[in-house]
Design a protein with these regions (language model features):
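C-terminal target-recognition/interaction regions appended to catalytic cores
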Residues: 68-209
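Class I S-adenosyl-L-methionine
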Residues: 1-102, 106-108
Length: 209
């Protein structure tokens, strides 16, 4: 078992962790190796704009909207800002009793910046405690923007209502992370079957891409 930070491979979520459990039989004397850390941190711009990870800007798609009052409040928050960037009277009104409690509460009224990774996505894009507002437009991320942040290919289709699609994406492990875990398992299996004098590796990692 190993705790993997999502920075281990090109993903776009900030400070996310996943408990990855890979079970190996005790009678197998080959050591499984988890994916090695990746030396580059990708930001939101890498997810939503044409560049190294994607060959086009994020496609347009449906998404949630903010109620007018929340939109009016978030209009006042700059990129990479949150509730502390609001005027004090609006802070108190918007935060309610939470204003007087301890803790940073940095997810409230949070607008993501282009030059930072996204915060961990939840199953709902507009929860008050875990706000993820678009950098330029005062709205939640759309379904396809959500999917890009989780490194889903643009061809991946989600089913159900908009809220169900958000939930599917929010519950997912980032695709690139899952792929790297898969490659590490393929490497282990190839070593195992090679040791058993198998003429052919069980799986070709080239075919698994």
């Amino acid at each position: 078992m190993k705790l993997l930070n999502f920075y281990c491979r090109p993903t776009l979520k900030k400070n996310g962790s996943a408990c990855i459990l890979v079970g190996i039989r005790k009678d197998i004397d080959i050591k499984y190796q988890y994916p090695k850390p990746h030396n580059k941190i990708y930001n939101l711009v890498d997810a939503l704009k044409k560049g190294e990870l994607f060959d086009c800007d994020v496609p347009k798609s449906a998404g949630s909207d903010y109620p007018q009052h929340k939109k009016d409040v978030l209009d006042l928050v700059p990129p990479k800002g949150y509730w502390r960037n609001l005027p004090i009277d609006i802070q108190k009104e918007y935060m309610g009793k939470s204003f007087y409690l301890g803790g940073g509460k940095t997810g409230i009224a949070r607008r993501i910046g282009w030059d930072e990774p996204s915060l961990t996505l939840t199953c709902s894009p507009a929860q008050k405690q875990t706000e993820r507002c678009h950098p330029d437009e005062t709205r939640p991320f759309t379904v396809r923007e959500y999917a890009r942040i989780q490194t889903f290919p643009d061809t991946w289709e989600f089913s159900g209502s908009i809220s169900q699609q958000y939930k599917q994406i929010g519950n997912a492990v980032p695709c690139n992370l899952g792929k790297e875990i898969g490659f590490s398992i393929i490497k282990f299996l190839n070593e195992y079957y090679s040791k058993l004098n198998s003429a052919e590796p069980l799986i070709s990692s080239a075919k698994a891409v």
